[in-house]
């Protein structure tokens, strides 16, 4: 069984506000242990968290070894003030504030830096994103500061501009990656970064009633086609589900994501995903 290279232990796949409330006073250790036990029972031995500001991912990291799970956490995700991500992570207004957050990640024992470079896919409107991307110059600075502190960088990036800028900045992985163009797929392959496409965040919304299938079906098809093209160009891809996102349940989403990736990658699925996860494990290494 493959690991899950993108989860949010704090989220429950149903209601993020209720999920936050369970941990607002302190991480709900009993819930975390149940989820870790379920992952272990499914044969999942590697988890990479996307961070939260309540310390849930860090607590899961501390507990995971007892379940035979290698757990990596950025402590919290970091986003631009006034942009997507503040509901879950920490914000900065200038580079000095960002440097202070990176130092805090190190002090807390975080393993890498998670940066939010864009908004979400608008599941009501094909081709539309919910926020403007970070400027390329800013992303270069953010990645450089993280690298100087000894951290690899995981970037939430939707839209061709955000992904291309993240790759140019030297990010080690890009998450989601909606609406990429051919040139950026070549850039991805040449960069050596890992793409974690989280197809199940789209696939599990189909036929659910909240968003139109007339948007979801072509969006999923586009993403699968570009996953296949990226692999053909030699890009690295890894399995990650965004577990905890709406309709994406911890544990069971791993098999669901695998099935969607297999539709795109065919008989080379295991070879491609093994290489991608190996790269994630190597580059997003635990901090001493």
Feature roles, as predicted:
Residues 61-79, 129-155, 192-200:
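Alpha-helix-loop-beta-strand connector modules within alpha/beta enzyme cores
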Residues 2-12, 146, 153-158, 174:
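Histidine-centered catalytic micro-motifs
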Residues 91-161, 167-169:
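Metal-dependent enolase-superfamily TIM-barrel catalytic cores that perform enediolate-based chemistry
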Residues 16-31, 82-100, 152-154, 216:
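Active-site mouth loops of central-metabolism enzymes
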Residues 2-63, 84:
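Metal-associated gating/positioning segment near the N- to mid-region
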């Amino acid at each position: 069984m493959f690991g899950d290279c993108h989860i949010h232990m704090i989220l429950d796949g149903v209601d993020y506000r209720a999920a936050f409330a369970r941990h607002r006073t302190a991480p709900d250790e009993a819930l975390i242990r149940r989820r870790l036990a379920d992952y272990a029972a499914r044969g999942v031995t590697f988890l990479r968290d996307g961070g939260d500001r309540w310390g849930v991912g860090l607590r899961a990291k501390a507990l995971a070894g007892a379940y035979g799970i290698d757990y990596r956490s950025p402590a919290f995700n970091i986003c631009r003030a006034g942009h997507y991500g503040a509901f879950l992570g920490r914000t900065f207004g200038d580079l000095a504030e960002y440097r202070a957050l990176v130092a805090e990640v190190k002090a807390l024992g975080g393993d890498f830096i998670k940066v939010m470079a864009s908004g979400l896919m608008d599941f009501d409107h094909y081709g539309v994103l919910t926020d403007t991307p970070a400027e390329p110059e800013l992303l270069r600075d953010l990645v450089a500061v993280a690298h100087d502190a000894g951290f690899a960088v995981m970037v939430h990036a939707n839209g061709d501009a955000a992904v291309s800028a993240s790759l140019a900045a030297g990010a080690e992985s890009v998450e989601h990656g909606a609406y990429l163009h051919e040139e950026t797929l070549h850039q991805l392959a040449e960069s050596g970064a890992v793409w974690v496409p989280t197809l199940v965040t789209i696939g599990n919304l189909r036929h659910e009633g909240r968003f139109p299938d007339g948007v979801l079906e072509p969006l999923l098809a586009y993403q699968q086609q570009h996953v296949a093209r990226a692999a053909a160009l030699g890009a690295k891809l890894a399995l990650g589900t965004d577990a905890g996102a709406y309709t994406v349940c911890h544990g069971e989403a791993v098999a669901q994501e695998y099935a969607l990736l297999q539709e795109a990658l065919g008989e080379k699925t295991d070879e491609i995903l093994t290489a991608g996860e190996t790269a994630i494990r190597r580059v997003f290494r635990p901090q001493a």
